[in-house]
Amino acid sequence: MPEITVRAKSKTYPVYINEFALTDVKEQWTKSLAKYSHVFVLTDEHVANLHKAKLDAVLADLPVVTYYVAPNGEEAKTFRVYEDVMTKMIETGLDRKAVLIAFGGGVIGDLGGFVAATYMRGIPFYQVPTTVLAHDSAVGGKVAINHPLGKNMIGNFYQPEAVIYDTQFFATLPEREMRSGFAEMIKHALISDHALLTALMDTFTEPKDFYTKDLTPFLQRGIEIKANIVAQDETEQGVRAYLNFGHTFGHALEAYGNFGKWLHGEAITYGMIYALTMSETVYGLDFDLAKFTTWLERLGYNTTFDVTVPFSNILDNMRHDKKTTFNEISMVLLEDIGKPVIFKAEDELIFDTYKSVMRNGGDLF
C-alpha cells in the first residue's frame, strides 16, 4: 500500500493512502489501538450516517469505543461544540492513556486534533479523513477551531500518530465537496509543481472526472509536497506559509459568509484568482489566467462573484489573518508557477486588486 512518511520536527508518522486503506491496516492498527485505555471517535452527522459501520467493523474487537457525533460543517469548529466534546470526554472518564480518532473531513480533523492537543494537555490521535479536502488538512499537524472574527484563530500544531486515508469514501461525496477538495490540489500544484498543474488540467476537464479518473496519484503528490514543506518548517515560521496561497483572501471571504455560505475550497478558489491577479501586478507573473479560469469553470467552479461583498469587510477580515503582523497584511504571491513568495501588501494594492478582480468578474459595488 502506498505510504508517505511525514518527518516533522516534533514527530515522524506515516500516511497510508489507497482505496482500501482501512482494511489493509486493520490488523496493525487495532494492535496499536488496543494499548490505549479508551478509543474516542469524533465524527459528524453526515459521516456517521454513511460510514460509521465501516469503522465499527475495524474497531469491533476493541473493548471500549465511544463516539461523539458533531454537527456538519464549520458549525462543528465552535467554542460550543469544542466544550461539549470536552464535557463528553470528561464524563466518559477518558484518561491520559486514551486515544482519539478524527473520522471525517477537514472540519472534523481540525476539531479532533485541537481536542486531542488540549485534553489533559494532550492525548494521541489518528486522522482518518473521508474527503478530498482533508488530504491537505489531515497532514502537517495544524489543528484549530474558529472564532467569529476569524477562521482557525484558536489552534495549535499537534501531529497525529498516523493518517489512514481510505479513498473509497469519495464515492459518496457530492460534486460540490469534490470540487472544494480539488481546489487544494490545484493550490499545491501552483506553489510547487508546474508539471502537476499541467497534469491536473489535462486529466480533469469536466465534473464527472472527479469520480471516473484516479485521484490517488495526484493526492499522493499533494501530500508529498506538503510533507516536504512541513519537514522544513513545522510551525510556519517561514516556508510553510506558502501553503496559505489563496487563503488570505479566501479566509476573509469565508468569515464574511459566516463560515457557511462558501465551502472552504470555493473560497480558496476565489482567493487563488485574487492572488494570481496581484502576482501579475507585483511580479509580472507570466500565467494565462484566462485559460486557467476557463478550465475552472468547465469543472463547475464559479469564478465570478454573484453577491455584494463590501471591500471594508474583506479588508477587516484580512487584517485578522494569522499572517498579519504589525498590522501589515502578508500575501502569498507567485513570481512564477512553483515559486511562491511572501509579500507585504499595502491597502491601496489590496483595493486595486480587488477592483480588478471584481471588474473581471462580478460587480460587488
Curated annotation (Swiss-Prot):
Its cofactor is NAD(+); Co(2+); Zn(2+). GO terms for molecular function: 3-dehydroquinate synthase activity; metal ion binding; nucleotide binding. CDD domains: DHQS. Binds 1 divalent metal cation per subunit. Can use either Co(2+) or Zn(2+). Zn(2+) binds at residues 184, 247, 264. Pfam families: DHQ_synthase (PF01761), DHQS_C (PF24621). It is found in: Cytoplasm. It catalyses: 7-phospho-2-dehydro-3-deoxy-D-arabino-heptonate = 3-dehydroquinate + phosphate. GO terms for cellular component: cytoplasm. Pathway: Metabolic intermediate biosynthesis; chorismate biosynthesis; chorismate from D-erythrose 4-phosphate and phosphoenolpyruvate: step 2/7. PANTHER family: 3-DEHYDROQUINATE SYNTHASE (PTHR43622), 3-DEHYDROQUINATE SYNTHASE, CHLOROPLASTIC (PTHR43622:SF7). This is 3-dehydroquinate synthase. The gene is aroB.
